[in-house]
Design a protein with these regions (language model features):
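Glycine-rich portal/gate segments that line the openings of hydrophobic small-molecule binding cavities
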Residues: 40-88
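Well-ordered beta-strand positions in beta-sheet-rich domains
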Residues: 20-22, 51, 67, 88-90, ...
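Short, ordered beta-strand-loop transition motifs
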Residues: 10-15, 53-56, 72-74, 95-98
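Beta-strand/loop substructures that line and gate deep hydrophobic ligand-binding cavities in soluble
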Residues: 78-134
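Hydrophobic ligand-binding cavity/cleft-lining segments
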Residues: 1-51
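Short, intrinsically disordered, mixed-charge
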Residues: 34-47, 75, 121-128, 132
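Intrinsic-disorder/low-complexity, polar/charged segments enriched in Ser/Thr/Lys/Arg/Asp/Glu/Gln
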Residues: 16-22, 29, 65, 78, ...
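Generic structural detector for well-ordered beta-strands
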Residues: 22-26, 61, 69, 92-94
Length: 134
């Protein structure tokens, strides 16, 4: 099984933008979770992480996006981070029929800071990492 990114969608309501992606990863959910829910894991495909307290209400710090909070946390299922300049990023994992993992991603933010192509590039990196077994 190889990973894939299904067509993303974008909505705009005033100055609020919402991006959605469905990413299929060729690894079991238990091995994908650390890539989304640990500082080391996020560094491997998303970018640097100053701090991440892996729990509801925990602190997260992302260079360039600022400090924030873990606003949803369900181990091996949901990690959601809300940061000062980056808005709300939600990672929702599900088992898929092929033995891999389906990642449903939502990013809600203000302004023009993020783009669909930028997230697609990040998810391509995440897929490569998963395919290597990292």
């Amino acid at each position: 099984m190889t990973g894939s990114i299904e067509q993303g969608s974008s909505q705009t309501h005033g100055n609020t933008h919402i991006l959605h992606f469905l990413v299929r990863l060729p690894r079991p959910l238990e091995t994908v979770w650390p890539a989304l829910a640990t500082a080391d894991g996020l560094c491997g495909w998303f970018g640097a992480v100053d701090v991440l307290e892996p729990r509801l209400g925990g602190v997260i710090g992302l260079p360039g996006l600022g400090a924030g909070q873990v606003t949803a946390w369900d181990v091996e299922r949901v990690a959601e981070y809300t940061v000062e300049s980056g808005g709300r990023m939600r990672f929702h994992l599900e088992h898929d029929d092929a033995g891999g993992t389906a990642l449903r991603f939502t990013h809600e933010f203000q302004g023009e800071g993020e783009t669909e192509s930028r997230w697609r590039a990040r998810f391509e990196q995440l897929i490569r990492q998963a395919e290597r077994g990292a």
